[in-house]
C-alpha cells in the first residue's frame, strides 16, 4: 500500500466552455465538413467527446440553461441503453429502484448537514405565494444528491433485520451550482443524472457489501473494455460532520474491505465526503487517460442524524420489548454522473459504439429509387427493426427493437457509404436488383472500429446476428 498526500483532479478539457457549447449547439458541422476539418485538427481535438458528439448529433446545449444538456434522439438512445443495462444488473445485485422528489425544504438539508457544508452548490428555490400557512415563504433547495431522500424512504416504515441489507437505486436528476468557468461538455454540468444507490445494512455486513460492490464495478468496466482500475481510500476532510470515533470506525471498515479485496489501493488523505470516507475508482480509457468514475462511501452519520433503526433478532422475539440498532449506510455509484460517463465512453470508443449500445444499428442503401427496390428496402427495414405489428396493435414490452434507417437520397452509393461510416452505423446494407431477385442482403459490418467485411445474408440470418450481438454485449 502506498500513501499519498491529498491531490486534486483537473478536467482534461481546457477549451473555453461557453464558446465550445455554443458552437456545438448552433453551428455544429455537418458530417462532411467535419471530415474536411479532420485533416487539419490534432488527434486530441478529433477524439474530444464534444467533436464526436456534434458529428453524431448526440446532444445540444443552450446559453439559456448553461450546464444542462439536451439529449437529441440518438444521444437519448445511448443514455437509455446505459440505464437499461444497469437496471438489468440491479436484478442480480438485489437493488430496488425508487423515484424521489426533486425539491426539498431547507429543513432537510440542515438535518443532513448539506446546508452547512454544501450550501454554495445548492440551488435555492424561494416560496412566495400569499398563503398564510406553515409552508408559506419557505426556502427550498433542488437536490444535489439523493441520500437524504433515501433516508426518508427508509424511515417511512418500521424496519426489521430480516429486510437488511436494503438496497435502493435512483436515477432522478440532480442539480449542483457549479461555477460557470468549470462547465465543460458532458463532463461538468449543473444538471445531471447519477446511477445513485444506497445500501442500508448491519455493521456485520459492511465488508461483504463493499466487496460485492467492488466486484460489480470491475465486472461492468471489464465489459466496456476498461480493465485498468486504481482504487483510492479518501479519508476525513477538514470540514466534516460526526465524531472522530465514528470516522475512525468508518475508515477502518473501508480499509479492511480493501485489504481483503486483494486489489492495490492508495490512501488519499483528507478527500472524503463531509459525512464519511469513500473509495474512489479511477479507470483508464483506450488512450491511457485516467478518469474518476465509480465511488463507494461508508456513512455512519446520516443514519444517526435521521434516527434510522431496525429491529434486531432479539427485538423480534422479545414480545413487547423492541431492541433496535442503527444501520450503516453505503453510498455507491457505478458510472457516477451518466452524462459524464457518456463523455468518457465516447472518447474511449472514439464514437465506435458496440452494437448493444449503438444508436444506429444499420442503414439500408438502395442502389436506385425504383419502386421495386424501395419496396424491398422498406420490407427489410420493418423486419430487421423488429417492429412487425400493425398500427392498431401494441408492441410487446419485452420485444427488442433495432434502429434501422433507409438512406435513399439521390447520391451515389459511395457518397452514402462514406456518410454512414462517419455516423458509425454498425451495419450497411446495400440493396440492388440482384438482392431483390434472390431475397438476400449485401451486408457490410463493422468490427474492431473501422475494419469491415461484406457478406451475402438473408433477412433472418442478419436478424439472428442482431439478437446474438445484444445477448453477448457485442
From Swiss-Prot:
Transit peptide: 1-27
EC class (word): ligase
Keyword set includes Protein biosynthesis: yes
A single Gene Ontology CC term: mitochondrial matrix
EC numbers, comma separated: 6.1.1.3
Pfam family, one: tRNA-synt_2b
Catalysed reaction equations from the record: tRNA(Thr) + L-threonine + ATP = L-threonyl-tRNA(Thr) + AMP + diphosphate + H(+)
Alphabetic keyword roster: Aminoacyl-tRNA synthetase, ATP-binding, Ligase, Mitochondrion, Nucleotide-binding, Protein biosynthesis, Transit peptide
An MF annotation (GO) of this entry: ATP binding
Entry keyword Transit peptide: yes
Any one GO biological process: mitochondrial translation
Subcellular location(s) per record: Mitochondrion matrix
Gene3D superfamilies linked to this entry: Anticodon-binding domain (3.40.50.800), Bira Bifunctional Protein, Domain 2 (3.30.930.10)
Source organism, top-level taxon: Eukaryota
InterPro entries: aa-tRNA-synt_IIb, aa-tRNA-synth_II, aa-tRNA-synth_II/BPL/LPL, Anticodon-bd, Anticodon-bd_dom_sf, Thr-tRNA-ligase_IIa, ThrRS_core
Family statement: Belongs to the class-II aminoacyl-tRNA synthetase family.
PANTHER family assigned to the protein according to its UniProt record, in alphabetical order: THREONINE--TRNA LIGASE, MITOCHONDRIAL, THREONINE-TRNA LIGASE
NCBIfam families: thrS
Name of the protein in its database record: Probable threonine--tRNA ligase, mitochondrial
Organism of derivation: Schizosaccharomyces pombe (strain 972 / ATCC 24843)
Amino acid at each position: 500500500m502506498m500513501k499519498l498526500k491529498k491531490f486534486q483532479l483537473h478536467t482534461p478539457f481546457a477549451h473555453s466552455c461557453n464558446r465550445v457549447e455554443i458552437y456545438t449547439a448552433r453551428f455544429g458541422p455537418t458530417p462532411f465538413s467535419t471530415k474536411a476539418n479532420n485533416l487539419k485538427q490534432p488527434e486530441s481535438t478529433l477524439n474530444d467527446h464534444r467533436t464526436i458528439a456534434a458529428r453524431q448529433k448526440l446532444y445540444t446545449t443552450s446559453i439559456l440553461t448553461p450546464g444542462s444538456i439536451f439529449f437529441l434522439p440518438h444521444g437519448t438512445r445511448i443514455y437509455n441503453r446505459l440505464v437499461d443495462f444497469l437496471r438489468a444488473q440491479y436484478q442480480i445485485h438485489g437493488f430496488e429502484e425508487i423515484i424521489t422528489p426533486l425539491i426539498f425544504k431547507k429543513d432537510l438539508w440542515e438535518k443532513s448537514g448539506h446546508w452547512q457544508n454544501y450550501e454554495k452548490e445548492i440551488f435555492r428555490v424561494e416560496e412566495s405565494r400569499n398563503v398564510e400557512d406553515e409552508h408559506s415563504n419557505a426556502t427550498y433547495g433542488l437536490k444535489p444528491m439523493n441520500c437524504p431522500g433515501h433516508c426518508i424512504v427508509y424511515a417511512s416504515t418500521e424496519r426489521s433485520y430480516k429486510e437488511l441489507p436494503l438496497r435502493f437505486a435512483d436515477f432522478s436528476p440532480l442539480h449542483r451550482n457549479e461555477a460557470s468557468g468549470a462547465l465543460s461538455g458532458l463532463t461538468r454540468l449543473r444538471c445531471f443524472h447519477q446511477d445513485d444507490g444506497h445500501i442500508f445494512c448491519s455493521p456485520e455486513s459492511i465488508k461483504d457489501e463493499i466487496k460485492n460492490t467492488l466486484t460489480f464495478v470491475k465486472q461492468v468496466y471489464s465489459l466496456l473494455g476498461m480493465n485498468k482500475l486504481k482504487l483510492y481510500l479518501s479519508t476525513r476532510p477538514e470540514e466534516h460532520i460526526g465524531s472522530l470515533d465514528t470516522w475512525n470506525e468508518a475508515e477502518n471498515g473501508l480499509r479492511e474491505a480493501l485489504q481483503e479485496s486483494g486489489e492495490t489501493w492508495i490512501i488519499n488523505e483528507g478527500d472524503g465526503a463531509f459525512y464519511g470516507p469513500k473509495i474512489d475508482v479511477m479507470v483508464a480509457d483506450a488512450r491511457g487517460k485516467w478518469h474518476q468514475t465509480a465511488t463507494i462511501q461508508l456513512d455512519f452519520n446520516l443514519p444517526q442524524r435521521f434516527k434510522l433503526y431496525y429491529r434486531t433478532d432479539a427485538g423480534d422475539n422479545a414480545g413487547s420489548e423492541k431492541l433496535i440498532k442503527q444501520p450503516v449506510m453505503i453510498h455507491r455509484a457505478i458510472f457516477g454522473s451518466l452524462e459524464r460517463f457518456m463523455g468518457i465512453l465516447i472518447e474511449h470508443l472514439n464514437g465506435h459504439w458496440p452494437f448493444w449500445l449503438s444508436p444506429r444499428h444499420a442503414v439500408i442503401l438502395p442502389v436506385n429509387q425504383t419502386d421495386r427496390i424501395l419496396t424491398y428496402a422498406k420490407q427489410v427495414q420493418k423486419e430487421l427493426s423488429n417492429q412487425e405489428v400493425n398500427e392498431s396493435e401494441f408492441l410487446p414490452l419485452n420485444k427488442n427493437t433495432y434502429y434501422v434507417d433507409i438512406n435513399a437520397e439521390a447520391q451515389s452509393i459511395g457518397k452514402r457509404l462514406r456518410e454512414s461510416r462517419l455516423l458509425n452505423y454498425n451495419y450497411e446494407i446495400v440493396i440492388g436488383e440482384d438482392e431483390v431477385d434472390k431475397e438476400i442482403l449485401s451486408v457490410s459490418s463493422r468490427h474492431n472500429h473501422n475494419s469491415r467485411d461484406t457478406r451475402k445474408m438473408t433477412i433472418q440470418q442478419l436478424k439472428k446476428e442482431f439478437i446474438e450481438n445484444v445477448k453477448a454485449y457485442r
